[in-house]
Amino acid sequence: MTPIHRIVCPIDFSPASANAMRVAIDYARAFKAEIHAVHAYQLSAYASPNSDLARDLEEQIRKEVEAFLATIETFGVPVKMALRLGVPYIEIVEAARELNAELVVMGTTGKTGIQHLLLGSVAERVVRTADVPVLSVRYVEPKS
């Protein structure tokens, strides 16, 4: 079995990504690995990457990522944060490559039909293009 030292866990502040982070923490504890929480985002067509708007947005996103991660018990597992500007699935795959991660753990909601056709699936694209194994963790909404 290939040892796992680094796990990339993409986050988008959704319950599905929180669920995936908990699974990534379980794997990290078992393998004594570190987690890189990656949030990839795109700018609007009206903002250049070097504009004040882009810098303000990055700072706002950084705070949101920190707040999101603060809600998840890590059990002492090191979690590093990375913000990536660009097409989400490409940035996730590139982050895994650059970090020499051995595993990507990401949430999915299992959308199908029109919703899947219109929005696509970041998880599906990561699975298709990543150089390392991708564990897709399906999130099922609790019934009320």
Place the predicted regions along the sequence by residue:
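Structural beta-alpha unit
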Residues: 2, 23, 70-104, 142-144
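Short beta->alpha linker loops
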Residues: 41, 60, 83-87, 109
